[in-house]
C-alpha cells in the first residue's frame, strides 16, 4: 500500500506538478498572447503612422505645387502689368508732348489775339477822325465797309510789277 500510497502520492504529486506546469504554461501563453497583441498594436500603429506621414508628405507636396503654380501665375500677371505700365507710360509721354505743343500754340494764339485786339482798338480809336457815325463797327458799315474796304481800294486790284532796275531805284534813294 505504501507503494500505492507512494504512487498515489506521486500520482497526486505528478498531477499537481502537471497542473502547476500547466498553470505556468498557461500564464506564459497568456503573456505571449498579450505580447503578441501589444506587438500587433505597435505594428498597426507604426503602419498607421507611416500612412499618416505619407498623407502629410502628399499634402505638403500638393501645397508646394499649388504655391509654385500660384507664383508662376502671379509672375505672368506681373509681367502683363509691367508691360501695360510701359505702354501707358509711352502714351502718357506722347500725350504730354502733344499737350506741350498745344500749350505753346495757345500762348502764340493768345499773343496774336492780343496784337489783333490792339490793332482793332487802334483802328477804332483812329476811325473817329474819318467821320464814321458812332455805333458803327469796323465791319458793319464802318471803316472796312467804306474807304478802307480792300475791295474798294484800287491798288489791291492791280498786279505788282517789279524788276531789278526798279528795285535798285527804290533802294538807292
Swiss-Prot record:
InterPro entries: bZIP, bZIP_plant_GBF1, bZIP_sf. GO terms for molecular function: DNA-binding transcription factor activity; protein heterodimerization activity; sequence-specific DNA binding; transcription cis-regulatory region binding. Residues 30-41 have a biased composition (Basic and acidic residues). One of its GO terms (cellular component) is nucleus. Residues 39-102 form the bZIP domain. It is found in: Nucleus. Its main location: nucleus. PROSITE patterns: BZIP, BZIP_BASIC. Forms heterodimers with BZIP1, BZIP9, BZIP10, BZIP25 and BZIP63. This is bZIP transcription factor 44. It comes from Arabidopsis thaliana (Mouse-ear cress). The gene is BZIP44.
